[in-house]
Amino acid sequence: MARGPKKHLKRVAAPKHWMLDKLTGVFAPRPSTGPHKLRECLPLIVFLRNRLKYALTGDEVKKICMQHFLKIDGKVRVDITYPAGFIDVISIEKTGEHFRLVYNTKGCFAVHRITVEEAKYKLCKVRKITVGTKGIPHLVTHDARTIRYPDPLIKVNDTVQIDLGTGKITSFIKFDTGNVCMVIAGANLGRVGVITNRERHPGSCDVVHVKDANGNSFATRISNIFVIGNGNKPWISLPRGKGIRLTIAEERDKRLAAKQSSG
């Protein structure tokens, strides 16, 4: 019987969205414990070495991190296996680049560059609202932040905008029909659309119906929905494709049209 924490991760057992090839080694970097789950995060070493190609080996990534060049959500991180997750802001001060981790429609984290202004805030989904000691209300977000004395109008499943400099809530978006959202889990991972309907199922999961910009409708559980803006206007910039999933035939037609226009 195994005792103690697991310290290794086989490459074939690593999450698919890390996009690691099977034949370049036996092991994959196991993410440290942190604000995001193992299957829903991207370790810094994978982001720097495999995505940005700023390093060739793990040792080079360690040397970059130990010089305090990398910040996640405004805080310096030196752990190369630190788990960055959905909507986190990764800043590299040496190059002046800022990235936000968001899903593309293939279900992988896109390398999405953002402006300096956008890197000053992030959105967080409200997971739980409780009352702590001495009657102090607490709000817990999807990235394990605990914020005291939130606005009484904020409810579970709403989205709060957090200033990364102060860590305080600057604004919030209600979970309501007509607001734009992104799917963060399940078969429709990475799709963006407007909430059209919410089916309530007491004792089970509520089902949310969403319509994307092309007019295609789909449904998913309420726990998979992350509201990202009021009305049709998202509060964060979206990666290429704007969260619209194309069918195989539509992708083929798009490729052919691009080839003909370039040729």
Curated annotation (Swiss-Prot):
Q: Which Gene3D superfamilies match?
A: 2.30.30.30, 2.40.50.740, RNA-binding S4 domain
Q: Which CDD domains match?
A: KOW_RPS4 (cd06087)
Q: Which domain of life is it from?
A: Eukaryota
Q: Which Pfam families match?
A: 40S_S4_C (PF16121), KOW (PF00467), Ribosomal_S4e (PF00900), RS4NT (PF08071)
* Gene Ontology molecular function terms on file: RNA binding; rRNA binding; structural constituent of ribosome
Transmembrane stretches, by residue range? none
Does GTP-binding count among this protein's keywords? no
S4 RNA-binding domain: residues covered: 42-104
What is the similarity comment for this entry? Belongs to the eukaryotic ribosomal protein eS4 family.
This protein is called Small ribosomal subunit protein eS4, Y isoform 2
What organism does the record attribute this protein to? Homo sapiens
Upper classification of the source organism reads:
Eukaryota, Metazoa, Chordata, Craniata, Vertebrata
Gene that this polypeptide is encoded by: RPS4Y2
